[in-house]
Amino acid sequence: MSTFSKTEVLLKLQNVPVVPVFFHADAQVAKEVVRACYEGGIRVFEFTNRGDRADEVFASLISFVRSECKDMALGAGSIVEEATAARYLQLGADFIVGPLFNERVARTCHRRGVAYVPGCGTITEVGNAQEIGCDLVKVFPGEVLTPRF
């Protein structure tokens, strides 16, 4: 279960200059990176679902963050479908990020009161995400769309 409400996560996101996006298959390495970020003032961290057993590493990170970095929101990134979102929410993700907008993922997150930040590459995608209740989207892919988007 998420430690922070959707509103708390969105407020944290407004107050941070950067959100680290990271994956490593070794839980100990991941913990060391999270700790270094936390000690550097980071309070929002996205661990991406990009490798084998990423969910197991995430489960270990959740326990670590809850005991060692108590005011850090830990989210799961690279989430593209509902079952994976549900798995990370079950593990305790404070927010879900995706490279695309998936209405089913949005509904799953909203039912549980968890922020969903989908990647959007067009104005239509942004509008669709807003209509279903996404308060924040990420411009994706950023290197293609650029800050002018």
Q: What are the residue ranges of the model-derived segments?
A:
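Conserved anion-binding
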Residues: 53, 69, 83, 89-149
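Conserved N-terminal beta1-alpha1 strand-loop-helix module at the mouth
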Residues: 1-83, 87-91, 111
